[in-house]
Amino acid sequence: MISDILAPGLRVVFCGINPGKSSAHTGFHFAHPGNRFWKVIHQAGFTDRQLRPEEELQLLDTRCGITMLVERPTVQASEVALQELRSGGRELVRKIEEYQPQALAVLGKQAFELAFNQRGAKWGKQAMTIGTTQVWVLPNPSGLNRATLDKLVAAYRELDDALATRGQ
């Protein structure tokens, strides 16, 4: 079982789709060696050094958190059913209403569209909010995603810069 990393007063909560098999095995988020999450958030400015998956709780020191839409581990996110995503979206709204971070970053456009029934979502900041929490859609850092490291870092940096502009 992989636990959420959440606390009140966070700048951002990164929301993955669901754990991969490596994460399920180790108990840490984004644990597969091919997953670029830890590298991307460091290079985008969220952390002062590249954390390892087993250091995930140190994210709270940077006012960042992690959760997932769906708890069930799979090899590929495409194995997650629509009903699981919709249910996960409702649970995610509950968590965000409870913790009220400045921003929620859903990592994957299709997962966001399905979980929140939002067709035609664009990358970046969304029109919808959850309370006062901004909602962003960022590319998934999975090694299965064809996005280059530079494109991932640029997308995540846009969020970091937007939060810095707001004094967060």
Curated annotation (Swiss-Prot):
EC number: 3.2.2.28
UniProt-recorded Gene Ontology molecular function terms: DNA binding; pyrimidine-specific mismatch base pair DNA N-glycosylase activity; uracil DNA N-glycosylase activity
One Pfam family matching this protein: UDG
One biological process term in Gene Ontology: base-excision repair, AP site formation
Annotated catalysed reactions: Specifically hydrolyzes mismatched double-stranded DNA and polynucleotides, releasing free uracil
Protein family membership: Belongs to the uracil-DNA glycosylase (UDG) superfamily. TDG/mug family.
Oligomeric and partner information: Binds DNA as a monomer.
Name of the protein this chain belongs to: G/U mismatch-specific DNA glycosylase
Origin organism lineage: Bacteria, Pseudomonadati, Pseudomonadota, Gammaproteobacteria, Enterobacterales
